[in-house]
């Protein structure tokens, strides 16, 4: 960056988890005040996160963000204070997600499948570890969680991505197989869960989401 250039000519983009949020997954009030002060003085600031709107907005509603926020790792570009989605990337086809689920289930991993219709939902059949249960507890609080016997979706729902939660040992071979088969079709993120470090997340979206 050229520090002789007016910083107000740049757009500053921050992540949430492991960056702005504290260890309890909250945005401290003193951080809200500092960021708002910078925005009020002309700073162009926004957020890019793997969270969806229902999860991100309660954390960010105190910020005076004027630019659209990037949600779900680039699946949605959204006006923060209205919730209006102004851009969508490509979604994952139903046939494709069926192939992925059939692979994942051979490893005895329970997937969460994200959809978007009129609302955001996360469908799952069950949980088999504390990391996944912790995630269910979180998404149940904002009514996204939908426990089902089989993965079936309405004609109005589009599949925005999927999530696997388990230990690194369990997920590493899943990641290797999916990345080998579908690296041109999927963006795959494999990392430690910042809130439950003994578990890892394998989260994936359409290749055009970034």
Descriptions of predicted regions:
Residues 114-210:
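Conserved acidic, metal-coordinating active-site core of Asp-based
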Residues 14, 77-79, 164, 190:
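Conserved hydrophobic "DFG−1" position in protein kinase catalytic cores
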Residues 1-14:
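Non-catalytic pre-domain segments flanking phosphatase-related domains
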Residues 3-5, 63, 152-156:
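Solvent-exposed alpha-helices and their adjacent loops that cap or buttress functional pockets
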Residues 26-135:
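Active-site phosphate-binding/coordination module
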């Amino acid at each position: 960056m050229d520090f002789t250039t007016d910083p107000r000519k740049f757009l500053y983009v921050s992540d949430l988890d492991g960056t702005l949020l504290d260890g309890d997954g909250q945005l401290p009030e003193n951080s809200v005040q500092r960021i708002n002060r910078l925005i009020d003085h002309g700073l162009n600031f926004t957020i890019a996160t793997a969270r969806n709107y229902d999860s991100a907005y309660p954390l960010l509603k105190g910020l005076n963000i004027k630019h659209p926020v990037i949600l779900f790792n680039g699946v949605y570009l959204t006006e923060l204070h209205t919730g209006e989605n102004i851009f969508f990337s490509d979604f994952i086809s139903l046939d494709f997600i069926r192939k992925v689920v059939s692979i994942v289930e051979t490893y005895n991993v329970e997937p969460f499948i994200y959809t978007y219709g009129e609302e955001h939902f996360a469908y799952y059949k069950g949980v088999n570890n504390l990391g996944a249960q912790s995630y269910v507890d979180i998404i149940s609080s904002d009514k996204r969680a939908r426990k089902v016997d089989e993965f079936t979706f309405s004609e109005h729902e589009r599949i925005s991505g999927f999530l696997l939660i388990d230990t690194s040992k369990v997920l590493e071979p899943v990641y290797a197989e999916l990345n080998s088969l579908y690296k041109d079709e999927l963006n795959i993120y494999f990392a430690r869960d910042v809130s439950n470090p003994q578990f890892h997340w394998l989260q994936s979206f359409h290749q055009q989401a970034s």
